[in-house]
Amino acid sequence: KNYDQILSKDNFKPSEFSLDRDYFVLTLHRPINLTDENLKIIFDGISEFTSNYDILIPAHPRLRDYVNRNGIDTSKFKMINPQPYIKFLGLVHNSTLCLTDSGGLQEETTFLNKKCLTLREETERPITVEKGTNKVIGVNKNIISEINDSLNTKLTTYKEIELWDGKTSERIFEDFNDK
């Protein structure tokens, strides 16, 4: 049911976010990326793509506070408030590419079979890399080439990940009942 809501045209209206073309979703919230140095690398790199793509940033309060406090120019991007979960997944599902430092979004892009670049040096979700939807790229001067590589790479067809079948609560319930 939730997956159907994610895909529903009623849930996702590009005009609501002034999206006129294909777009990237960027989420940042980890303190390691909320520094002048790292934000400059990330924003400068992603800015290279604004002539062809909208950059949608559902801004975590920590990112918004940092940007406002430090007067960082985000005029090339569409910074929006955090969205309800299903609507956010609709944005992700309809995007061309996701860039994130969020572990949760790495999983969600894998489930939705969407390309994801992780702006960290490591991931707690290695299965997302193994399945080929996610690439850990860190934050460095190679961000432009990494985005280009991702845009020019076709994803393989999604194969269900063991235990990612929506039946976790049933397994937990059975486990409690067996004890």
Name what the model sees in each region:
Residues 43-59:
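A conserved nucleotide-sugar
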Residues 117, 132-137:
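A short acidic/histidine/glycine-rich donor-binding loop in glycosyltransferase catalytic cores
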